[in-house]
Amino acid sequence: MRESRPVIAARGVLLALALTTMSLSPFAASQATAQIESSDATFNEAVQAVKDKNFRHAVKLFSIQAQNNQHDAQYNLALLLEAGKGAPQDFTRALTWAWAAQLGGIEAAEELAEDLAGYLPEKAIEGVRNEVQERLRARIDEGQSAAVTQFATYHLLMLEEPDFEAAYIWFSIGAALGLEGALEARDEARENVEDEKIVDLQREAGTIYESLEIIID
């Protein structure tokens, strides 16, 4: 039997819950930024549903939060879908949300995503990649600044082989927007790009940048 995973029980609060027949380790503290009051209330209600073993209700509530890009909820939803609690076991959906949570800074999601990818054929994984990519682009088109650096990171971590050129473009855009960590990540990506391609990539980054209407949080 595999070791239990840490799951996020509450924003800033540690609890021990049971998702499997074994005792789970305490939930990891949330890395999400400040949420609106109703969002916290929904999250806490979902956590209580897990404690009460009302997994179906927990999946419903975490799904609402996951769709609204709450990364702690995305991680919890991925755990439930992996376990088949509250919804039939679904490794494809679980990987979608695990990757979203990983891109959102939930460290525990990385190991979960690796395990889930190990259960799936490459064709299914490619489908998840496409879904995650489309979701990120939609968020960028909506003006969500966090999605810019997440999209850059996606090209480094989620593809079969890192795409340093795309990562350089999007980290360049993030740096121009003043997003935290983007400048350093841009320079690291540049080290893996051929010099003769830099001008074209910078031009492409500039064109994309001018087309975006990003809202800085």
Regions found by a protein language model. Give the residues of each.
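Bacterial N-terminal signal peptides that target proteins for export
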Residues: R2-L14
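Bacterial N-terminal signal peptides
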Residues: G12-S25
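N-terminal leader/linker segments that initiate helical-solenoid repeat arrays
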Residues: P26-L61
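Short helix-capping/linker turns of helical repeat alpha-solenoids
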Residues: E37, K53-N54, Q67-H71, A83-K85, ...
